[in-house]
Amino acid sequence: MAVKAADRVVIATDDDRIRLAAEAFGAEVVMTSEDCQNGTERCAEAHSFLGSKYDVVVNLQGDAPLTPHWFVEALVAGLLADPGADIATPVLRCEGRALTGFQEDRRAGRVGGTTAVFGAGGRALYFSKEVIPYTGRTYADDAPTPVFHHVGVYAFRPAALAVYPSWPVGPLEKLEGLEQLRFLENGHTVLCVEVEARGRQFWELNNPEDVPKLEAMMADMGVA
């Protein structure tokens, strides 16, 4: 793995097909319960098996295979530098082209991605599958916008991760289907860390229509 200072990389899954595929290329695998409701619960369960000697635990989810290593490095650095934050997650400022794509997806009834709004010091205010904030205008394709695309990668302090499964699913998490809202609904601080794509193509798997797009991007990058 290209991430600097990663002490250990583990694949957590409840599926033997994934376990077998991962073990075939030498990965360490932890089998978790089928009862995990989301990736954060799965990460918490896996961490409970591995011990508590780590300062930061990162959850890099399988639906974001194009996540570059510098996103993860920025999260870890941001969390370690901010003792008031319990979780860190990356955000990308949308240019007009990306914003238009999100808006077109929503008009078609699809979720193009999750957006985030945050206040002073990067403190998250809300995450939504709707496009927020409302802008009321159009932007040139390469113009920066006030909309930030949330990338579903998380860096946790172990104590915050450990308590997460004990909380019930809140109304906002249930409505949006966004696991990170459980932290906000329980008064924990989520740090949004702005990252840059550096010319790297990026997309997440949110809809079946995203599969060929991701496969094409991976082929262009030589990782398919």
Residue ranges and their predicted role:
Residues 11-12, 33, 154, 204:
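Active-site-adjacent beta-strand anchor residues
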Residues 6, 52-54, 82-87, 188:
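Short, high-confidence coil segments that cap the C-terminus of an alpha-helix
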Residues 10, 16-77:
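Short phosphate-binding loop-to-helix
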